[in-house]
Amino acid sequence: MNSLGNLENYQKGFNESVVDITEPRIYFGLQTNDTIVTNSKTKKEFDYLSPDGSNVTNEYNGQAGLKLGFFDRMVFAISHGDTKLAFSSDISSESKIIANRNIINRAKAIMPYLVYDENPYLVVSDEGRLVWVLDAYTTSNYYPYSQKITVNNKEINYIRNSVKVLIDAYDGTTKFYITDRTDPIIMAYWKAYKGLFVDLDEKIPEGISKHFVYPEYLYNIQANVLKRYHNVQADVLYRAEDVWEVSTYNLTGNSSNTISQIQPYYTMVKTIDNSQNTLGLVVPYTISGKQNIVSYLVGSYQNGEANLKLYTYPEDSNVLGLMQLDTQIEQNEEIYKQIASLNVSGTKLTKNIVVVPVNNKLLYVEAIYQQYINEENALPILKKIVVASGNKVAIGNDLKEAFSNLVSQNAIGIEIENTEDIEDLIELIIKANNNLEQSSANGDWEMMGKDVEKLQSLVKKLEETYNKEKSKNNDLDITLDNTENKTENEKDKVI
């Protein structure tokens, strides 16, 4: 990567796939919190800098805002505590005041009974206009026989993504579309506030709906609940025997205090049951206390519908976990040297890792950044990329080089081991035996049968693990004996 970060390649990509935007100006967004006055009599609105260095100005022609008569100016001046608005000579009869420009606050002011996603996204309509997509939810804490969770200091046990709010970034036009008619709460709101929602028969324009993604707010809640409730067997749930955790990784690689859970992220995925690449949210899981990845959750938007699917690996699969990848990197002298050379005085290293499903395999991409800690406002600089797939790992200065090394002879083989050792199995056997004693004391014959099967399975697994460890130790003893014999023979030759 050159000093410009290959900007010429990015520019080339933009030129080849031009997005036709007819109105690029954003008056309504996430950071637009101030009330503004447009079309001033004396001051022109700065738009952009022309190639010759002169300022290009703009006049607002949208329908948003109120034209200000003298009485209106007095009212706004009093409400905002600003006398300039009332007596400024810059304001004419063509001037407009535009308020409520923060799109989330704007939606809340219109319909305060919904919960709004904190991560709206901007799309381009077929007409070339910028439109914000804001997901909205109905919630309740009265759903029967359902466990409550706390979200933003509020207890809920019911949530539905029943509304899509579309907000024009230029003129602030706000439309509420009902996307789930099976939700009784939103249908009650529809009957109570019929003028608020778009007609049920009116569909969201395809030029906008084709850009929809799985809502991150809902996904985070579902991914968290799934850690326990992926298993629907009552006895397993009651005993909390099959609890998952979101995979963790080391942010810096040099301190256990920097271990962090991987955050859900949008990426292009190609799952085993879908021939097309799809933009989706992904998070991998491990069994609580273990390191191997056992499953991953994909949230995507396909064929106009939200789709959430869990992909699990067989119990005996050894799928590389994120902490295991870090360990393999540290144990490999060639890769570790390249990373360690970046950790010089006055700098710190940070990492970010994503796991990308490709068919039934996982591709691991780890970016390593260097940042100068003594420089004010110093930005992290991408220095290395580590990629891994299957039992191979490679490193490069950029993504292209890392991938090239992964599929070449430069790739390094890694050993993926199941993290379940003999001590872990003994703990599980003790727990299973306690469960058997409890079900026996309760006279629960069905549960006793399940507990006996579980105990037998664990004992068998312990025996297999023990024999495997014993065989490995025997091989090591043979190797050491051969080494000692070879050394003695060499001594005899010298004598």
State each model region's role.
Residues 1-442, 446-469, 473-484, 490-492:
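Soluble extracytoplasmic regions of secretory-pathway and membrane proteins
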